[in-house]
Amino acid sequence: MGKLQEVLKHPDELVPLMQMLVSDYYTKIVPRDPGLGFCYRMLNKVSRSFAIVIQQLPELLRDPICVFYLVLRALDTVEDDMALPNDIKLPLLRAFHKKIYDRKWSMKCGYGPYVQLMEEYPMVTGVFLKLDPGPREVITEICRKMGAGMAEFIPKEVLTVKDYDQYCHYAAGLVGEGLSKLAVGSGLENPVLLQKEDLSNHMGLFLQKTNIVRDYLEDINEEPAPRMFWPKEIWGKYTKDLADFKDPANEKGAVQCLNHMVTDALRHGEHALKYMALLRDPQYFNFCAIPQVMAFGTLSLCYNNPQVFKGVVKLRKGESAKLMTTVKSMPALYRTFLRMADDMVARCKGEARQDPNVATTLKRLQAIQAVCKTGLRSSIKSRKKQAATPLSDDFISKLVLVLGLGYCVYAFNLLPLLWKSALIPGPPPPALTSSLGLPHQIIAVFCVLTAGYQVFLRGGLA
């Protein structure tokens, strides 16, 4: 009942939700190869949202990135397992990149689906060893750097913002570097990405910091003793103990610290947009853009929100689906980021106007707005060229809408009515007077809604 109420409150999310259901169905169709089948089943278990975007990648990239993700999730499982003593964990993190070449290596650690990933790790190894040498080298190199970085931070706290940036570089910035190398190595992406490691690093930090901000309560309540990544340089300005933010009596300081953390994460947004503006493969673009827009949406939701210290804060499924289906091009991504930035600016000038960091928050948001506005202006000429092309996306969307409307007329047996309204003498031919039945009517309505929604996103029928 709750989900139905959500849909009724946000009817514009219905079509994206239906599209996401279709995408979700296809993620469950795994390859027949036992090794690849295991990898894609595990991918669905450890990250449904990531499974959806990986399945949309070009074939050249799909399997290497799936394996890349699982290798790094396994490494992350070792890092996160607080039951592993450091004398075992540290050498393992530093040597983990070598385990991917050992067909027999596995271990028991982690929790939930990660237990199966670690126990059946040879299945991942088998697929990895079948990859071309180029992807294998990239995965090995990034795993080596990440493992060494994680080992560096196991015995020490994240004290400064510089420490925070460095840890997030190891945990996620290196992922961006590896993805760029895989994409360029496949021949699908712009070689200039290899010269823009700073931008790919910002992509990773934007995602990682969003997760760290959002997961405060889950992380602080972890047993045994939790590892926290909020830098003391920030939280030390608002409390003597990071755990104090769980106490409702400390809500004011907690929210101020939260806003400070969100503001820090926002500095990566403009650079993430600059990275994505360099991409040329549409499927790889979607793969990169969807997590970034979800991260910005989550940061916006967390900003000035005391619920972060009380429970789960996440985007509605319909809202997530709408975001995932709207960012199909750079102009669409600019518009979405600009809308979110505008919303946050309004809140900074309203509900959060007394926040001690509001001036810096506004500065970061204005930087994002500037990149979006500049990008949209520069895309006007290319959009006009695209509109003049007979087979542009706009043309196809409108064509599908017209065909869908025709299908609706036929499926609902409306042709006799149109025949009479057109003042055509005589009855319509028998072939035009039969209804196709409920299944066809449902499909026809879905086609019209989907095509109509895409036409609306692209600026209407004009």
Curated annotation (Swiss-Prot):
Essential cofactor(s): Mg(2+)
EC number(s) on file: 2.5.1.21
PROSITE patterns with a match to the protein in the record: SQUALEN_PHYTOEN_SYN_2
SUPFAM superfamilies for the chain: Terpenoid synthases
Residues binding NADP(+): R48, R73, R214, K314, R316
Positions that bind Mg(2+): D76, E79, D80
A Pfam family reported for this protein in Swiss-Prot or TrEMBL: SQS_PSY
Top-rank EC class of the record's enzyme: transferase
Bilayer disposition of the protein: Multi-pass membrane protein
InterPro entries according to UniProt: Isoprenoid_synthase_dom_sf, Squ/phyt_synthse, Squal_synth-like, Squalene/phytoene_synthase_CS, Trans_IPPS_euk-type, Trans_IPPS_HH
Catalytic activity from the UniProt record: 2 (2E,6E)-farnesyl diphosphate + NADH + H(+) = squalene + 2 diphosphate + NAD(+); 2 (2E,6E)-farnesyl diphosphate + NADPH + H(+) = squalene + 2 diphosphate + NADP(+)
PANTHER family for this protein: FARNESYL-DIPHOSPHATE FARNESYLTRANSFERASE, SQUALENE SYNTHASE
Record protein name field: Squalene synthase LSS
Originating species: Botryococcus braunii (Green alga)
